[in-house]
Amino acid sequence: MNRSGTMSKREVDLEQYFTTPEIALSCVELVEKHYDLTKFDNIFEPSVGAGAFLQHLPIRTIAIDIDPEMKCNYLGDFLEINFSKQRSLFIGNPPFGRRSSIAFKFIEHALPSAKVIAFILPNSFHKANFINRLPTNLHQVDSLDVSGIWNGNYLNLTFFIYEKRQEEREKIVE
């Protein structure tokens, strides 16, 4: 964000809406309500940005970002990284994209290695047409409304916790 309080062109192009440390803490605490973080093979923050989630996650968390100016320990495009572990936690605030297209790509890319995907996403992920676009073996465990001012813009957002399971969930018929 520049001195006038508006987003820079770089932030807009990379869809950088940084999570506050307070929101990140609330999100991590919600995950910890359901899971022991030490039981995951790996923990990935796929779009680390300024590192708000890292303050509240174990030191072994792998922080990924495409922007070299961010607090990552792995510089690169999350969507081009291959993951091998099967019981991983993916947590963070990925870019959304038009009609959440990038957010869906992040979810789909994480899924083969994920046990849990916990992302800040637009409130539209509560709607049947968005839920039905998610892989059917991904089940919502919990959520937290994190709507508010993000980099000078009011955004309707929710922190969703999804768990990958063997059983398929039913599609929602409207």
Q: Which residue ranges define each predicted feature?
A:
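Class I S-adenosyl-L-methionine-dependent methyltransferase catalytic core
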Residues: M1-E174
